[in-house]
Amino acid sequence: MATETIILKELSIGYHTKNGTRVVAEGINAAIQSGELTCLLGANGVGKSTLLRTLSAFQPALSGEIVIRREGVRSQEISAYTDKELSRLIGVVLTEKPDIRNMTVRELVALGRSPYTGFWGTLHEADWQVVDEAINAVRISKLRERMVHTLSDGERQKVMIAKALAQQTPVIFLDEPTAFLDFPSKVEMMQLLRRLAKEEQKTIFLSTHDFELALQVADKLWLMTDELHIGTPHELAQSGALAGYVERPGITFDAQTLTVRVNNDKL
C-alpha cells in the first residue's frame, strides 16, 4: 500500500546568482508516495534538475519544508538529518559523468555500501552479496570486471543505478536515468524501477524526457510547466495538462490512448 514518504510544504526552489535570486517554482504542496514510480516531466530549463537537487539535499530550498516520513520514526525536515543519515535514506543518480579511473564496475557499485561500513570502509561478505544482487538486477553481470572508464554512456548509467540499488535506501531519486539507453534498454530500466517500487515499497522519483514511455509505466506524473500538475497519467490526460504540454502544429495528443500523433503534412 502506498504511503506518503516525502512531503513538500510551501516549497520554493531556485538558486542565487550575482544578480539576485532566481525562483524556479514556489508554493509547492505535494507528496511522493512509497510503492509508486513517479515521473517528472517538463521542458528543458523548467527546473526539473533544480527540484531533484533540492529534494536530494544537494542544494537548499529557498523556503518551505521537505519532510521525510518513516514508519515508526518521527517525521523530520530534511535539513535535520546528518549526511550519514541521509545516505541511508536517499539514493541519488544524476546525469553527471563520473571521472573515475582505475576502478572496476564491481568496485564502483560497492561504493553504494559506504553508508554501512566502518571507518576503514571494509566490506563484508553480506555487503558483496548486496553488490552482486544489484549488478544482476540491472543486468550488467558481463561488465562486472570492466574498468569504468571504458564503458559507454549507457553502460555507465546502468552501473550508477546499480550503485544506488546497492545503497539499499527506501528513497531513490534519478535524473534522466534512461537518457543514454537504446529503446529496449529504456523500457527494461523503467520496468525495473517500477518493479522495485512495487515489490520493495521503495519511493522512486525520476525525471525523464521519454514522454510516452513515462505515460505507460508511471503511477504518478509531476508535470512542470508554468505550474506543477500532479496526478496519474489518465488524470493529467483528462485535465488537458498533457495536451497543453506536448501539442503544437503537427503534433496532437490522444487523451484516450495516451499517445502522441504526428501529422507530417502540418509540420
PLM features: residue spans?
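Helix-to-loop junction immediately C-terminal to a conserved catalytic motif
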Residues: 56
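Conserved ABC ATPase "signature" region
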Residues: 110, 125-143
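Catalytic Walker B motif of ABC-type/P-loop ATPase nucleotide-binding domains
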Residues: 172-175
